[in-house]
Amino acid sequence: MATSELSCLVSEENCERREAFWAEWKDLTLSTRPEEGCSLHEEDTQRHETYHRQGQCQALVQRSPWLVMRMGILGRGLQEYQLPYQRVLPLPIFTPAKVGTKEEREETPIQLQELLALETALGGQCVDRQDVAEITKQLPPVVPVSKPGTLRRSLSRSMSQEAQRG
C-alpha cells in the first residue's frame, strides 16, 4: 500500500507586539488500497494455472486546522466532515474537588496541619545538616587509579593464550 503525504507549515511573527503564531499539520494523504468487490480470480486445474487480479483505488484524506476533514476516493468526489472540538490536553490540569466558600469547605486533617506547622517551623532547613568537609572526613582516602597499560602480567603471553584455548 503506497502512501503520499503533504504537510503544511504556517508561521507568522509580529515583532512590534512581540507575538508569534506557528502551526504545522498533515494536510493531504493519498494512499493506494485494494478496492472492495473488485477482484478477479481464475483457476485452470488442467493446466495448473491461476490468475488473480485485485482492483485498486486511491483514497484521499484532507485535514485542516479548522477541524474540517474531507475524505473519499480520487475521481469520485470527497465527503466533508466537521470534526468535534477537542481539547489539546485530554484532561484539565487542575480541577478543584469542591469549590465553595470557606464555611462550606472541610477542615484540613490534623496530621496535615501538624506537618505544615513543622515545615514552616524548620523554614526549609534540615536539622541534622552537616558540612561537606565533615562528610568527606568520614570517607576513606581516594587512591589514584593506575593506567591499564601499566598493570603487570602474572602469566607470559604464550601461557595466557594457552589458557584461553583450554
Swiss-Prot record:
Q: Keyword check for Cytoplasm, yes or no.
A: yes
Q: Which UniProt keywords apply?
A: Cytoplasm, Phosphoprotein
Localization: Cytoplasm, Myofibril, Sarcomere
Looking up InterPro entries in the UniProt record yields:
Telethonin, Titin-like_dom_sf
| Gene Ontology molecular function, alphabetical | protein-macromolecule adaptor activity; structural constituent of muscle; titin binding
What broad class describes the main subcellular location of this protein? cytoplasm
The record's function comment reads:
Muscle assembly regulating factor. Mediates the antiparallel assembly of titin (TTN) molecules at the sarcomeric Z-disk.
Residues the record lists as Phosphoserine modifications: 39
Task: Give me the ranges of the annotated region Disordered.
Answer: 145-166
Q: Which residues cross the membrane?
A: none
The residue ranges flagged as biased composition, category Polar residues, are 156-166
Q: How does it assemble?
A: Interacts with MYOZ1, MYOZ2 and MYOZ3. Interacts with CSRP3. Interacts directly with the N-terminal Ig-like domains of 2 titin (TTN) molecules. Interacts with ANKRD2; the interaction is direct.
User: Mind listing the GO biological process terms from this record?
Assistant: cardiac muscle contraction; cardiac muscle tissue morphogenesis; cardiac myofibril assembly; detection of muscle stretch; sarcomerogenesis; skeletal muscle contraction; skeletal muscle myosin thick filament assembly; skeletal muscle thin filament assembly
Q: List the record's Gene Ontology CC terms alphabetically.
A: Z disc
The protein's name is: Telethonin
Q: Does the keyword Nucleotide-binding feature in the UniProt annotation?
A: no
